[in-house]
Amino acid sequence: MGEPKKSASLSDCGINDQTWNVVIPILYFLLFPAALLLNVVVAWICSLMKSNSSFMVYLKNLVTADLLMTLTLPIQAASMLPKASSGLQAFACRFSSVFFYTAMNMSTILMGLISLDRFLKIVMPGRRFPCQSLLFSKVLTVVVWMLLIGSTALPIIITTDQDPANKSNEFCMNMKSVLGVSWHDGAVKITEVIFWVVCILIVFCYVCITKKVLESYHKSRSSNSQKKSQTKARVFLILAIFFICYVPYHSVRIPYTKLQVKINPGCLKAKLRIVKNLTLWLSATNVCLDPLIYFFLCKALRQKFLESRIFKWFPPITGRNSEMTSGTSM
């Protein structure tokens, strides 16, 4: 299908394709500097900390996934621009997009593992499970990385090897072989199942954690309403960020993919593509929000940040530091 026919079809659907092809890349370009700064700072701080617990192992891997996702943002944005070269689009389809999705899926899984780790330590403090060992967490993260790369990233890179018939909105799908299209469809379905399982796990774990912490305050007859409010706020922050960033995208991903693998275009497909791109950008904003979660919820990381050279020109504020690091990490 030629380009003029495509434009007319989109116009008939009430969609200004050229506008969206500029707006969405700009959103990614605006996101990149803040994401890079925050993730580089957090990665540097994490490099100064020892991996002496399963929580720290998961946290460091989460930082790695977020940093990888951040580094793909400018390529993703540039390839979406109307005048992007076919070579850049092909590189984005075959490599940067693949690593973007791999990092995003890994980030989701690690958030689930962190919530489970917090659940076992706070809700079941008297028991020690094998999955809480340092060795298990290291092996598990390596296995998950290998499974994601081996089952989704590498096969998609290998099967995205065709010369696209035309420069259209389905440029990436046109680069996939028949096997590549089927693999893409299967990979999306599998990662969607993983996401919704992790979503349920996170909600369950943090609701139980909140209940346990509030019961602990009640049993100790603590009247510190500020700490209770902080506990509720922390849990709300985690759940709110997770739901706002990820749920919209994953809600439209399956219906869009079903239409994406079909040749015939339509208004529903065109509209879902815009919604998918916007919600995908919303998911990408998580790379800015995750570092804030690390800072507010991880006492050890917050302490290391306050002790870092970033503050060497400022006088120490002992009282404030003590107050900020007194909370329990979640």
Residue spans of the language-model regions?
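Loop architecture of class A 7-transmembrane GPCRs
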Residues: 7-15, 83-97, 102, 133-137, ...
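Helix-to-loop junction signature of class
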Residues: 28, 32, 68-84, 97, ...
